[in-house]
Amino acid sequence: MQTVTTRLFISGALCALSTTALAQSSVTLYGIIDTGVEYVSHANAAGGHVFRMPAVTGELPSRWGLRGTEDLGGGYSAVFTLESGFNVRDGSSGQGGRLFGRQAFVGLKGPYGTMAFGRQYTMTYLALQGADIIGPDIYGMGSLDAYVPNARADNSVTYMGTYKGFTLGAGYSFGRDSAGTGNSPGQGTCAGSVAGHPTECRDWSVMLKYDAPNFGVAASYEEQRGGTNAQANFFDGVAPTPLGNAADKDARTHVSAYAQYAGARLGAGWLGRRVVTDSPAVPNVRSDLFFVGASYFVTPAFLVDGEVFRIVNSVHDSRATMGALRTTYLLSKRSSVYAQAAYLANSAKARYSVSGGGGGTTPAAGIGQTGVMVGIKHAF
């Protein structure tokens, strides 16, 4: 009897230890698969149209990832995220072929915030989350500035802290883009960490935002330094500006706000970009991007949202206005179908493309474009 009692006690103790260990650490597998069929008018200089399955995104870029945490006690925990982007139409890896191109970091979380190390989003991307209504959609802000939905940096150290609704964020990269084809089209790579050149290919960004139950405001600043193979693309058909010197700067400043009430949400903001070069032969360039959007749940399962964008680049004499409308029907908590359409009007010299679906749809100068897509999205 004593032997049986002892065995039961040992078994119970092991179960208790196992339960405690499980409570102290966890790893979550998650992902999104999003694709569909798209039509784009005037998709080349000859005015031809295209039907296709886009490579990059629909409502959201497809991805899978692992997210984990370990409780270290005293309010501290170790955290990590490994997130891989992929293209549904052919199964290839995104972000220049990186295995974990969307995010790959490890860090420490505590009562005073989180510090993390690795490939991470910059503060530009994080600060826009509240006000940019349709986000990284195929007909979103990325059509006019493709860096915005791809604002990540290799070799980065970040800090995020929240207190009574305020969030302070900061990031610093020792070399922002060291693999693949660059974080956005035409940007080039910029590996950095070169001996004797402490600022080459650096990226630093800061963010301050405030979120209340029914509204929020945010501001951010990001500065990229030049280096070998670095460029600045304005996505308007003009050749990218070379940023070969560490003194060259590509800076983005952003302010935005949002409000929400009873199933409705309204957001608006401004994103200013300034490229300043160290060479008198290379002109400085600036652009200003304005946006306003709204969303409304008509029923708990039916969402309608849309956004209007306006970009002005006075140096290139290029301007564009784009409007997008999207409807989403929720089949379940994890699956949905959607239909969306957008129209982009280019000024006489501009060649912005309405679609952020992976290139190959640049129109002739001054020509407008229509984009239409129907798709399906599943989250796990």
Predicted segments with their positions:
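N-terminal signal peptide c-region/cleavage motif recognized by signal peptidases
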Residues: 18-21, 26
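Detector for outer-membrane/organellar transmembrane beta-barrel domains
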Residues: 199, 206-324, 328, 340-341
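Residue-level detector of the transmembrane beta-barrel scaffold of outer-membrane proteins
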Residues: 28-30, 77-79, 114-118, 167-169, ...
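Bacterial N-terminal signal peptides that target proteins for export
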Residues: 1-10
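Solvent-exposed loop segments that connect transmembrane elements
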Residues: 41-50, 92-94, 175-201, 224-249, ...
